[in-house]
A protein has these predicted regions:
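Extended, helix-rich architectural segments
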Residues: 1-118, 435-436, 440-444
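Short, charge-rich amphipathic segments
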Residues: 2-41, 149-152, 204-225, 247-273, ...
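C-terminal anchoring/interaction modules
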Residues: 2-3, 251-270, 274-288, 309-444
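Short secondary-structure junctions and interdomain/linker hinges
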Residues: 18, 33, 73, 89-92, ...
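Generic structural signal for hydrophobic core residues of well-folded globular domains
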Residues: 30, 42, 46, 51, ...
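Extended, regular secondary-structure scaffolds
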Residues: 101, 107-200
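Extended, charged amphipathic alpha-helical segments
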Residues: 178-312, 316, 349, 359, ...
Length: 444
């Protein structure tokens, strides 16, 4: 029985280490950290003396394009007090969404930053282990390595770990020795776990493995292509019928003396560069389609697409976006519950419910279409002039927008008075000119 238990523990430990390796690779590809190191083993050491390894980064662009929920942001309505506490939330949530798309599952700690003006901060954690009670999808505790100041050459201390549950925080060294144990009064685990999609048979959801796999293939193919181009340009010297050894120097400034009957030639591989390029395009387009994206290459050109054509082309991605809205609305509720509990422990009361409105990205409209759309919304009382001005200039507050509109109306009314006077003058001028002409005729 102990043998079975030990085997299960070893398997779980192995799976945890493999997951950490996958997360590290995902983060490296997104950040562009030594991406060449992942394909270096595919080539012999002598290749590195010929060309540098290709380090193309399509992962970051794909992940950023897939993350649309917080592209523009979200409007949260829970009172002025909550608005002040969450000044950083929209910016942090944009990054959290991207990292969730990349890693599959991340943990975000909700931090109460005290000071003259307290506020929430949100710190994502990528490498972590969770503990459960009865529900395998609801963690009750978490442990993770504490980030060290690795850029500080004077810091050589051991790695520290943090442990959190609903009652206490524990700091440990890498040997498991407790450094500090501090109780807290939150009454809740101060972490929110976000997943790129709904969980199936495990707490963790896999990340963007297909994207980094395609990225790896692209880097290998591009490196091979550059290596082939080098050999095609310079070729490989080949000599027959002469016993001169392999260390002969060749070049345009070198004369070789060959014995009678020997031959000297330069051969080059017959690889098709265009086929390699088409294969790279196929890989990129395939992974893009699998993630509801489409790729347009620079040489395709063509007319600038209209908003309607973009909507039709992007229909599948729009449906996927609507599915994600429901998921992230649930995560926003989870964040708010944790925020509310933490605020209560510091004597701050927040409303029971959070009003939330995700600001959806819009497709471009022509000027005429935009004018008609704005006029329709004003006539149907879907928006007022203040809200419309704030859409065009979101740096304005409602009070500033209201003052701007009142000032513009007053100025336009004055201009309209002068315009009416000018038009009246233009109407009377031809009549007066005709009378003057008749007088001149009578005098003659």
């Amino acid at each position: 029985m102990n043998y079975i238990t030990d085997s299960i523990k070893e398997l779980k430990l192995y799976n945890a280490k493999k997951r950490e390796s996958r997360i590290e690779k995902l983060l490296d590809y997104y950040n562009g950290n030594d991406v060449a190191g992942y394909i270096r083993k595919m080539f012999s050491a002598s290749v590195f003396n010929e060309i540098p390894l290709t380090e193309v980064n399509i992962t970051r662009r794909f992940i950023n394009k897939m993350s649309r929920i917080y592209t523009i942001g979200a409007t949260r309505n829970a009172g002025d007090k909550y608005e002040g506490l969450t000044a950083l939330k929209s910016t942090r949530m944009k990054h959290i969404e991207r990292m969730t798309r990349l890693c599959g599952t991340i943990a975000t700690r909700v931090v109460w930053s005290e000071g003259e003006t307290p506020y929430y901060d949100y710190r994502p954690v990528y490498f972590f282990h969770v503990f459960f009670d009865d529900d395998p999808f609801v963690p009750t505790a978490i442990t993770y390595p504490i980030l060290q100041p690795v850029e500080d050459a004077s810091q050589v201390q051991k790695l520290h770990y943090a442990y959190w549950d609903a009652e206490k925080y524990v700091s440990m060294d890498e040997d498991g020795n407790i450094i500090a144990e501090i109780p807290h009064t939150y009454g809740v685990l101060p972490f929110v776990f976000t997943h790129r999609e709904n969980q199936t048979d495990s707490f963790y959801v896999e990340g963007a493995n297909d994207i980094i796999n395609a990225n790896e293939h692209v880097n290998i193919a591009m490196t091979e292509m550059q290596l082939g181009l080098r050999f095609q340009m310079f070729g490989q010297p080949v000599m027959t019928g002469a016993q001169l050894g392999n260390n002969q120097r060749t070049g345009s400034d070198v004369t070789l003396e060959l014995p009678e009957g020997s031959t000297y030639d330069i051969v080059a591989p017959q690889g098709n560069v265009q086929n390699v390029i088409e294969n790279v395009k196929f890989l990129v387009e395939l992974v893009a389609q699998n993630n509801h994206l489409w790729v347009q290459w620079s040489e395709q050109g063509g007319e600038v697409p209209s908003g309607i054509s973009m909507m039709i082309k992007d229909l599948e991605r729009t449906e996927d976006y609507q599915d994600d809205l429901a998921l992230w609305r649930m995560y926003e509720d989870d964040f708010y519950e944790v925020e509310k509990q933490i605020a209560s422990s510091f004597g701050v009361s927040l409303p029971n419910d959070l009003g939330l409105d995700f600001m959806e990205p819009e497709y471009p409209k022509t000027v005429q279409d935009q004018i008609l759309w704005d006029k329709h919304r004003l006539e149907m009382n879907l928006i007022d002039e203040v809200g419309l001005l704030m859409e065009y200039n979101n740096d304005l507050t409602s009070e500033q927008a209201e003052l701007t509109i009142a000032s513009n109306k007053q100025r336009n009314e004055k201009l309209s008075i002068f315009e009416k006077a000018r038009q009246a003058a233009e109407r009377t001028t031809p009549v007066q000119s005709g009378i003057a002409g008749q007088d001149n005729g009578l005098s003659r």
